Amino acid sequence: MNIDFSDPDFQYLAVDRKKLMKEQTAAFDGKKNCWVPDEKEGFASAEIQSSKGDEITVKIVADSSTRTVKKDDIQSMNPPKFEKLEDMANMTYLNEASVLYNLRSRYTSGLIYTYSGLFCIAVNPYRRLPIYTDSVIAKYRGKRKTEIPPHLFSVADNAYQNMVTDRENQSCLITGESGAGKTENTKKVIMYLAKVACAVKKKDEEASDKKEGSLEDQIIQANPVLEAYGNAKTTRNNNSSRFGKFIRIHFGPTGKIAGADIETYLLEKSRVTYQQSAERNYHIFYQICSNAIPELNDVMLVTPDSGLYSFINQGCLTVDNIDDVEEFKLCDEAFDILGFTKEEKQSMFKCTASILHMGEMKFKQRPREEQAESDGTAEAEKVAFLCGINAGDLLKALLKPKVKVGTEMVTKGQNMNQVVNSVGALAKSLYDRMFNWLVRRVNKTLDTKAKRNYYIGVLDIAGFEIFDFNSFEQLCINYTNERLQQFFNHHMFILEQEEYKKEGIAWEFIDFGMDLQMCIDLIEKPMGILSILEEECMFPKADDKSFQDKLYQNHMGKNRMFTKPGKPTRPNQGPAHFELHHYAGNVPYSITGWLEKNKDPINENVVALLGASKEPLVAELFKAPEEPAGGGKKKKGKSSAFQTISAVHRESLNKLMKNLYSTHPHFVRCIIPNELKQPGLVDAELVLHQLQCNGVLEGIRICRKGFPSRLIYSEFKQRYSILAPNAIPQGFVDGKTVSEKILAGLQMDPAEYRLGTTKVFFKAGVLGNLEEMRDERLSKIISMFQAHIRGYLIRKAYKKLQDQRIGLSVIQRNIRKWLVLRNWQWWKLYSKVKPLLSIARQEEEMKEQLKQMDKMKEDLAKTERIKKELEEQNVTLLEQKNDLFLQLQTLEDSMGDQEERVEKLIMQKADFESQIKELEERLLDEEDAAADLEGIKKKMEADNANLKKDIGDLENTLQKAEQDKAHKDNQISTLQGEISQQDEHIGKLNKEKKALEEANKKTSDSLQAEEDKCNHLNKLKAKLEQALDELEDNLEREKKVRGDVEKAKRKVEQDLKSTQENVEDLERVKRELEENVRRKEAEISSLNSKLEDEQNLVSQLQRKIKELQARIEELEEELEAERNARAKVEKQRAELNRELEELGERLDEAGGATSAQIELNKKREAELLKIRRDLEEASLQHEAQISALRKKHQDAANEMADQVDQLQKVKSKLEKDKKDLKREMDDLESQMTHNMKNKGCSEKVMKQFESQMSDLNARLEDSQRSINELQSQKSRLQAENSDLTRQLEDAEHRVSVLSKEKSQLSSQLEDARRSLEEETRARSKLQNEVRNMHADMDAIREQLEEEQESKSDVQRQLSKANNEIQQWRSKFESEGANRTEELEDQKRKLLGKLSEAEQTTEAANAKCSALEKAKSRLQQELEDMSIEVDRANASVNQMEKKQRAFDKTTAEWQAKVNSLQSELENSQKESRGYSAELYRIKASIEEYQDSIGALRRENKNLADEIHDLTDQLSEGGRSTHELDKARRRLEMEKEELQAALEEAEGALEQEEAKVMRAQLEIATVRNEIDKRIQEKEEEFDNTRRNHQRALESMQASLEAEAKGKADAMRIKKKLEQDINELEVALDASNRGKAEMEKTVKRYQQQIREMQTSIEEEQRQRDEARESYNMAERRCTLMSGEVEELRAALEQAERARKASDNELADANDRVNELTSQVSSVQGQKRKLEGDINAMQTDLDEMHGELKGADERCKKAMADAARLADELRAEQDHSNQVEKVRKNLESQVKEFQIRLDEAEASSLKGGKKMIQKLESRVHELEAELDNEQRRHAETQKNMRKADRRLKELAFQADEDRKNQERLQELIDKLNAKIKTFKRQVEEAEEIAAINLAKYRKAQHELEEAEERADTADSTLQKFRAKSRSSVSVQRSSVSVSASN
């Protein structure tokens, strides 16, 4: 880079090399110098002092303080040679600290531009720098990036050069947050392009005195105008653009500017009437109040004081560094340069001033009226004057606007708030329209009509904003920035890497985590924020609260980008309703007023008034939109009446993104250095945040790793083959080979480039080096070429001099000879006689020549006349030819249009057919729903009849109860006086109560309650009154239930009636649509026939036109030949004239005739005669040719006239057809209007439905949209009817193709019917299989009950064994050591029984292996069934596709769908039955688990007893040899028993897993229909947690094992010190070591099996999910589900049988073990050496059993979730039971009262008591019946409600299914990755534990070697152990505790 640093232009662009050398030579230690995090500076420079583990002590360079930081927090520091680096992609260490330091160091040195790979970073300097002058522009023009310091001009020049060389549109995206300097950089880019590519000025333009500037000046001066009207002061930026603009600068073929245009986006209109305290309105308001141009004050009627106007005095009035006076003058000058007239300027200023006066209009409320009135008219008159309207009309339109009610206009009163809002809306609308007009006017000036080839677009959009109060405008701005950032990320990170993959380059995809699509989808997708806002704007009663509720309902908790706002972090922060997570930060938004802002309402009366304004500009701004011409095309999308602000912004933003994607982008990232707007100050945290959000580091990384420069092979070969000409082989070679040879010839490093499929890719900077090499080679070649050219020119001049020299010598020689001959007399005579030889007969010849000349003149005139006629005819023919050619071209164009339209019509027809099919399917669904409702209605009517009957019975019962109550009241009055006598009769009452208990056992509980209540007779009266009150309450409740049932009945009847009416309307609409379709098909067929005829005519015309063209070409050739002949004759005539003149001269000189002259004259005469004859023949030929041409022309003219007549006839015929079609279209449109009205009625009726009919609403709305689309298509057809005649060939071809397809589809329909019949037969077969499954399930239930009984027997036997053990223990403790011999005998018996148990264990193992084989076989069968299900799904899918292709099969499909629906309901019922059975199976499994737990506890108790017994047996002093033998034998028996128990438990767990899988499969069928995808996510979360817990439990067990090994090592070390106490323990350790090895191997095998089972379960879940997703979309998949159920039931049956066999075996084992317990005491002496090993093994067994229990419980968690619904039903039944018990208690109280009455009145006798008792029983029975009926009624009501809710939610779930499935797939993929990562971590942990175990094993082996040395002391230990029993007992207890 050759830079003159003394040049002042580079002071703020490049660092002085002398200063930089000092900085680059500073001391540096790469191992010590580093960056550490710092709260204030972001990162601080430090030196590493020491390190300890993950913590490092560093010394801060700035203050010499020390600090301890983590190793991961330290970032590497670049060497000093990278100081103030211009391109950060060249850094050695790329990290945040280095980037921040480089930017800060350059910024503090005044260098604001830095390259960052492919884009440029610009830091706001907050001051003016002299780096944008013309001299700087000249220095950057045409320079490469590496030749000159970083600058914005370099980016602009690069874009310009790319446009010129690559012939591709370019764009400069200048992005950043608000206040980062985007607007200023945009102006500099435009200025640079205007200077570099300025067009050549004309002299007359330079000499003119007009104020209009050149095109470049106009482009530059457009910015001040737009800034005045579109920029304002905000809290972060004094000159913030409150609108977005995309400036396109167009260039011509030569690279010169050919024009420009500006597109604007989203002007912030709300700022016109409201600003925050620290902000300002738009600059133009303060400029017109600055008194900069005093003469305008009178025009605008403004006072030069901005504080007087309420619209602009809400914030600050002045801004630092902005002079409103000077800015207004610049703005006025810019208007002049842009060509605005004085009238246009004044009109704009008037409109601007009128907005100020609108803000001063005052209104007040009339007392006691809802009407406002004007509080003064001065400001209104000013507004009216400036806008050119009447003040009274303006006030009237504001205060009393007219609204249309029906067909009449009614005056509406406005209150004060409404009027003020209307004025504000008018001001905002006026300003918005004026701004848009200003942009259009500027574009008109910048449009030069010159030829445009390419353009460079410069984008300046309002930056990302986070204010204290963020509203709708901030959402739109931030949404735009989100899209632009996504474009940057996609272009930089995604497209770049995708191109590598596409080109076949070896590249590993890098995910930078910069995808913003989730946030964008949240805003713009259907049911996103903007979509919900637009939907709410269409509802008249919608408000901010309803909008907020919809947002929360759709997104809160469902999208992590949408959250509730946190607590305000700033004191001035306004209230917020939700918070979005944007790429630049979290922004809280307030939705207050969003609906009004989005609808942008305005008073239509004022609009109409302003449209008729006297001011031309105001009238133009508010003129009514022009109606489209009749038959013209209508715009797609919403009409202008419904075009909301969000929809317009989204449409314009999509257009902008489309433009950007079509260009080659260049990015400039603007950075805010600090919030204080101070130059030279860098806020590290703020800058780092912007770098992270903008993807700066990621952009640098991909620039360094990737290959940003690329060229296609042809361009590379053409441009760089000059560098290696010898490397290119001769002949044809493909571009890739040539490029590879060129690169090889240049000896380039292969790491610097890659060869793709079509392009060659280079690392950053490599292409610049190639350009430099090319320039050097070109300079050498040019120098050689210049040398060759100069040599050639010199040689050519030398040769010319030689030729001149030869010519001079020849001339000199001839002159010398002439000088010799000139005095010779014979020469003189010769020279005199020679002229006289040709003078003979000159006069005669002259006369003849004159005659010939006259004749030739006549012929020539005649020929000229004929020539003119022919030329005129030729011109006429050419014109006709051109007309015909134009007509042909028009016909061809219209044919192309018609072809497209025919294709669209065919597609539309297909769409309509599919829509009709969908409507028919929906009608079928609705008919099914109506049928269901009819059944429900009938059932409810029957229930109502029963209820009426029951209510009548209850009323009779209540009447009787009331009579009884009156009677009982009388009795109570008598009882109150006799309470004291009741104590004597208590015994008698008790005896009678016992007799009643014997008589009726059912009332035993109630009699017991009566005995209890007899003790509280003093409370009898209150209790009886309470019972009566409860009866009355029950009666009221029953009445209320009856009323509710009646209401529900009436409502259901009404709903059913309206549904039937809707169905009838839909059927009628369907029939009409079918009739229209048939009519249209007939019309199309007629049109096709017409088109065929006209096609033949057109083909004939085309052939004739081609013949005429050939004839015309022949005529043109003949005319050309005639012209050539005429020219030849003219030339001959001129030569003859010249010869005649020469003859005349010679005759004059000769004066006489000689014989020679006479002979010569004869020859001349003969020649003249010959010439004359030739002329006559030529004239005759010409005349013949002319006559032939005339004839041909006449024939051609006649043919053309005939063709024109035929075309006129065709035209008239087509116009007639057009009128007929138009009339038919009008009829069809009227019919569609009628259909629309019917549809509206249907919608009104449908809105009356409850939530169960919401799916009908959605479908009807779809139908309405399809009808609207049909209408729009019809309107387009009206405009396109005139061009239908030109679609003949394609229409004919398509008709033939359609006929073929129709025949093919008809054959496919027959195949589909046959396959459907086969499917029906298969379905019936499956139904039979399901019935068989029911029978199998009953058998399974019975077997489970039997297993439960056997389990209870086992438990009883175990309890008996425990009792026996306790007895033996107590007996042993009493008898002591005297029973040792008996224990030995019993031990031998126990050994025999243990051998038998070993045999049973082997048998159990064999059974387990058989079960495993059965499991694998069942798994294979399950996979086969899933394949069959997939095949069935595919066939059903194919049949559904075929079904949609035909209308004729609709009725057949309806019947089939109805049958499928009934089958689906039956399957659902069966599924519910299966679920109930599975609940019972689950209960049995829980009981099994309890029994297993009991067995485990019993096992532990036995082990404890053995432990105690061995402790006691240690006192016996038996021999070590016998103990060793017994220990080994028992150890083997224990291992075998434990293995058998583990295998049995594993088999049981497998069977439980099988049962659970079957249960989950059946439950998933119902859950998939009810709960859909959410349930699946919960299942996968549970599965993930279960697997995680399982892995954790295995890890814990391994860790516990390692810990146990460590404890064992400590114990061994302690026992080595005391060898006498360690002999038995060492043997146990040796045995324990072998056991541990086996245990570890077993654990490893279990881990592998667990992993395999996890993967297998995951695969099975994926397969099940796929099948269930298919079941959701197609009801016919129920056949596949039934097959799965059958397979599951068969598997459950096999599992049940296997478990039954295993249970029987287990029972046998338990019986054997129970019989063996009696012999345990005899074997206690030989169990002493096994205590420690058995205790360890038992602990491990317990750990494994606990893990198995946990896994089983986790597997049961899903089943427990399914039981929640059953529990809810049980709770409800409990409540009903409570009510029943209350009634029973009342009956009991009646019984007590009867007893008391009987006791108190002995006179009544037993007859009265019996009568009362019978009455009580009757009441009790009636109450029970009533409660039962009430419960049935409630159950039926719940079923009906559940069915209605299912119908309501089904449609919504189907619509959302696809999106949820996609999200679920993504989530599941992420979860699978997480699971894999967790499994890998678990494997690593297992490997670590295995290493620990091996280490422990090694230590154990060493301990064994040491133990061998202790054998010599074994005899001493035996003698010592016999003498000291107490020492042995203590040692054994210590080892047992360890």
UniProtKB/Swiss-Prot annotation:
Pinpoint the IQ domain residues: 778-805
Give the Basic and acidic residues compositional bias ranges: 1041-1058, 1212-1225, 1286-1303, 1310-1332, 1344-1354
Does the keyword Nucleotide-binding feature in the UniProt annotation?
A: yes
Task: Report the residue ranges that make up the Myosin N-terminal SH3-like domain in this protein.
Answer: 29-79
Please indicate if the UniProt record lists Coiled coil as a keyword: yes
Gene Ontology MF, one: microfilament motor activity
Localization per record: Cytoplasm, Myofibril
Q: Where is the Myosin motor domain?
A: 83-775
- Region annotated Disordered, chain positions: 1041-1062, 1187-1332, 1344-1363, 1898-1938
Record GO cellular component, one term: myofibril
Residue ranges with Polar residues bias: 1265-1285
Under CDD domains, the record lists: MYSc_class_II
Composition-biased stretches, type Low complexity, lie in 1922-1938
Domain of life (superkingdom): Eukaryota
Sequence positions that bind ATP: G176, E177, S178, G179, A180, G181, K182, T183
Please give the family membership noted in the entry: Belongs to the TRAFAC class myosin-kinesin ATPase superfamily. Myosin family.
> What quaternary structure, including any partners, is listed in this protein's UniProt entry?
Muscle myosin is a hexameric protein that consists of 2 heavy chain subunits (MHC), 2 alkali light chain subunits (MLC) and 2 regulatory light chain subunits (MLC-2).
Q: What does this protein do?
A: Muscle contraction. Myosin is a protein that binds to F-actin and has ATPase activity that is activated by F-actin.
Protein name in UniProt: Myosin heavy chain, striated muscle
